Amino acid sequence: METLKIAFTDSNLLSGIFIVFALAAYFSYDLARNYMSALIELKLKESVDLAKRRLATARTESERRLATAELLSAYNQICIAYLNKQILSESFQRSYRAKIERIVNSEEYDEFFQDSPEDYLGIFLVHEKFKNRKRGA
């Protein structure tokens, strides 16, 4: 599966989607689903990594705000995918769970959440899901 993740870049995304459907038609739905999951996980991880790099290289306050908003947006995309458990592998979900908790509990991002909470709805839905799971345990 790692080889499949490495093979995907933005330039051949359409080819990757075509391959998913070909795999589903020829071999099995599970193989195609795993392939699509790997593609989605790769794209989500790339968007987080890119936002982190932009945040690290930001020089002005406006660049930092923009990079932070991009990072939160990337984490929000992960949360939306997390809500649809069939998309992400268990290991991928576990690796980002603590990060999402830290984001919601950190005062650093409160300003962004207050300015446009609808942009980060996925983060809040996943956070509520975690809280409810803790109460039930």
Regions found by a protein language model. Give the residues of each.
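Amphipathic alpha-helical "stem/stalk" segments
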Residues: 36-137
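Membrane-embedded hydrophobic alpha-helical segments
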Residues: 1-39
